UniProtKB/Swiss-Prot annotation:
The lineage of its organism: Bacteria, Pseudomonadati, Pseudomonadota, Gammaproteobacteria, Alteromonadales. GO terms for molecular function: 1-deoxy-D-xylulose-5-phosphate synthase activity; magnesium ion binding; thiamine pyrophosphate binding. It is an enzyme of class 2 (transferase). Coiled coil: none annotated. This is 1-deoxy-D-xylulose-5-phosphate synthase. Its EC number is 2.2.1.7.
Length: 621
């Protein structure tokens, strides 16, 4: 499916940055309007991240117009905002395939395009990568420029300031564009600031500034006075003191939707030496009224008709596991004011909106700072509170040292509600929850649970809440639950005990998590025994012994990496018990799982009922 490009006459002339740079500057505002219109139609047909890209249209046009990409390096942070970049870098005709199996990648991806200089998906990485590229450019005397684009939300991450501190020390030429779309840093935007930014980035101002530094080098007292005077003058209209203290020359804030102002300011900044930061103000969802009014709700969207100004009504379905968690948290908080909900900037995705509204004093958004969120929970546990850290599997990776050092080592009762475990789908390898069972299982003092349905999920969350001898984790997938009838009464499960779900012959399937339904279907065809193991750690030793003693073959099934996962734990236990037995491990292979619809990926990897049955039949043949 492609669009009639004749509707976008200027965009039709800019399929690549080289073509874009041939256009007169006077047509750039029209190009931005057409690019926004194309993005609107494209995402409407394909689904995907939406509001962020609408806010970076003018910025993207200006960057590729001023900088000689791909020779000059452009590094995007996270990548939600990079759809306009993909459209302008030769992928326009394939944008309708974005996030689909075999289609355009949802984030900047090195394997996909030479214009994607660094593969991303998690936040806060851009400045570190760009700094290294700037150092490399200087070592090679390549004459190339390096630009990192980062949003104000990502600025809450510690890695960002680690990189900026290092950049200020190394003093290599690089530009950081701070895309501020939440008004969280400054409200000083307008013609005065646009004009001031162009003056401060201009050759005359910077020449005087650098010359004065040299003249005053031998007069430290006067030099310090001049420095403070400049800071106060800039501070009257710009909030750049923090960045200046880190060694950056700060310019802005300017209107990020004024493409001419962006072009002129960036042209000036190309000629500046040392680390620079350009602060721009943008509006997430710019140009589409519903997204401007609700940028969070329109952050990522299903397929929709832009002309209706509405997202399609959700089809009736079972509650998601995230919603099950959110309701459980509210139920517990009603009874215990010491229950605290902590999330690293994933309130909506983790199902915590209602909790945050009903229990604001018990809710904490730690921002995009996963390391802090984990240790924040540990501190509360020290004081007798019941912290619940709601976090995506892929983002818990970023707080792994804190999980070990600050939580498990001290046996602190922090409950981790781990969302998006297993195959996530369209967001691809940066977001698949493939590794959590493996990296948690090796940590002493951890109790790890994997529910097979939403009722087990509630009971396991309650079990973690009641457990006081160390950290617990309940790991569940993205999307709709199974439709199981929920038991309102919550009862703590005995730690490390599984449940036999079907009695069969010769083959025993040990299931971990929501693959249980597929295992039961496969078991019917194979007349196999099925156990819902429930606990990844500690394993149900007696149940494993019984299954091994009474069956010829054991099969473990999990939506996690086979290496180091629950199946590995079963093998280790059998070895300890001196019970050698053929064991088939079914799970995710030793590779990064690409993007696509979850059901497509599940089928391709043999994790649906038919795939499980076939793998077992092949193993015993």
């Amino acid at each position: 499916m492609s669009f009639d490009i004749s509707q976008f006459p200027v965009l039709a002339q800019a399929n690549t940055p080289d073509e874009l740079r041939q256009l007169p500057q006077a047509v750039l505002p029209q190009l931005a309007d057409e690019l926004r219109g194309f993005l609107l139609k494209s995402v409407g047909k394909s689904s995907g991240h939406f509001a962020s890209g609408l806010g970076t249209v003018e910025l993207t046009v200006a960057l590729h117009y001023v900088y000689n990409t791909p020779f000059d390096r452009l590094v995007w942070d996270v990548g939600h905002q990079a759809y306009p970049h993909k459209i302008l870098t030769g992928r326009r005709e394939k944008m309708h395939t974005i996030r689909q199996k075999g289609g355009v990648h949802p984030f900047p991806w090195r394997e996909e395009s030479e214009y994607d200089t660094f593969s991303v998906g998690h936040s806060g990485t851009s400045i570190s990568a760009a700094l290294a590229m700037a150092v490399a450019a200087e070592k090679e005397q390549a004459g190339r420029k390096v630009v990192a684009v980062i949003g104000d939300g990502a600025m809450t991450g510690g890695m960002v300031f680690e990189a900026m501190n290092h950049a200020g020390d190394l003093h290599n030429d690089m530009l950081v564009v701070l895309n501020d779309n939440e008004m969280s840093i400054s409200e000083n935007v307008g013609a005065l600031n646009n004009h001031l930014a162009q003056l401060m980035s201009g050759r005359f101002y910077t020449t005087i500034r650098e010359s004065s530094k040299k003249v005053l080098q031998g007069m430290p007292v006067i030099k310090e006075m001049a420095k403070r005077t400049e800071e106060h003058l800039k501070g009257m209209v710009v909030p750049g003191t923090l960045f200046e203290e880190l060694g950056f020359n700060y310019i802005g804030p300017i209107d990020g939707h004024d493409v001419d102002a962006l072009v002129e300011t960036m042209r000036n900044m190309r000629n500046l030496s040392g680390p620079q930061i350009l602060h721009i103000m943008t509006k997430k969802g710019r140009g589409y009224e519903p997204a401007e009014k609700d940028p969070i709700g329109w952050h990522a969207v299903p397929k929709f008709d832009p002309s209706t100004f509405e997202k399609p009504a959700a089809k009736p379905c079972d509650p998601t596991f995230s919603e099950v968690f959110g309701k459980w948290l509210c139920d517990i908080a009603e009874k215990d004011e010491k229950v605290l909900g902590i999330t690293p900037a994933m309130r909506e995705g983790s199902g915590m909106v209602e909790f945050s509204q009903r229990f604001p004093k018990q809710y904490f958004d730690a921002a995009i700072a996963e390391q802090h969120a984990v240790t924040f929970g540990a501190g509360f546990a020290c004081e007798g509170y019941k912290p619940v850290v709601a976090i995506y599997s892929t983002f818990l990776q970023r707080g792994y040292d804190q999980l070990i050092h600050d939580v498990a080592l001290q046996r602190l009762p922090v409950l981790f509600a781990i969302d998006r475990g297993g195959i996530v789908g369209a967001d691809g390898p940066t977001h698949q929850g493939a590794f959590d069972l493996s990296f948690m299982r090796i940590v002493p003092n951890m109790v790890i649970m994997a529910p097979s349905d939403e009722n087990e999920c509630r009971q396991m969350l309650y079990t973690g809440y009641c457990y006081n001898d160390g950290p617990t984790a309940v790991r569940y997938p993205r999307g709709s639950a199974t439709g199981a009838k929920q038991v309102e009464t919550m009862t703590a499960m005995p730690i490390g005990k599984g449940l036999l779900k079907r009695q069969g012959q010769k083959i025993a399937i040990l299931n971990f998590g929501t693959t249980l339904a597929s295992c039961l279907v496969a078991a019917e065809a194979l007349d196999a025994t099925v156990a819902d193991m429930r606990f990844v750690k500690p394993l149900d030793v007696e149940l494993v012994k019984e299954l091994a003693a009474n069956h010829d073959v054991l099969v473990t099934v999990e939506e996690n990496a086979i290496m180091g996962g629950a199946g590995s734990g079963v093998l280790e236990l059998l070895q300890t018990l001196k019970m050698p037995k053929p064991v088939l491990l079914i799970g995710l292979p030793d590779e990064f799982i690409k993007h696509g619809a979850p059901e497509e990926i599940t089928s391709e990897l043999g994790l649906d009922a038919a795939g499980i049955q076939k793998q077992i039949e092949d193993f015993i043949a």
